[in-house]
C-alpha cells in the first residue's frame, strides 16, 4: 500500500468537524481507519447528539473504510504500550500505528506526540 493512509480518530474528527488540518485529511482520501479508532469516532459523534446510523453514514460519505482489528494488529499494538505509555498514547493510537505498519501505510493524526518516538510506520502529524 504505497501512498496510502490509515487515519487516526483525531484526523477523522478533524475532517468531519472542519478543524484546522481538515484539508490535508481530505487530500488523503480515500483512506482506512481501524475498528478501534472508528469506535472512538462513532462515540464522539453520538456523544455530541448525532444518531449512530447518521454518524456511520457521515464517515462512509468521506470515503473512510473501517478495517477489523485482528490478532496480529492487537499483538503489535500491545507491544507498543511500553514505548508509548509515558507519552499518553491510547489503545486507539497504538491500534492505528499497528494497522498502518501492517498495511505499509502512513498514519495520519492530529497528535504531534506521535513524532516523539520511533514508530513502526511513517507518521504524519497535522498539528
Language-model features: where?
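Short, well-structured N-terminal submotif of metal-dependent ribonuclease cores
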Residues: 1-33, 45-57, 127
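Acidic, PIN/NYN-like endoribonuclease modules and their adjacent C-terminal/linker elements
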Residues: 2, 97, 101-127
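A generic structural signal for short hydrophobic patches within well-formed alpha-helices
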Residues: 12-13, 38, 114-115
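A general structural signal for well-ordered alpha-helical segments in protein cores
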Residues: 22, 38, 74-77
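Amphipathic alpha-helical segments within well-ordered protein domains
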Residues: 26, 42-43, 59, 78-81
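Short loop->beta-strand "edge-of-pocket" segments that line small-molecule binding or catalytic clefts
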Residues: 30-33, 62-66, 106
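Active-site neighborhoods of divalent-metal-dependent phosphate/nucleic-acid chemistry enzymes
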Residues: 66-106
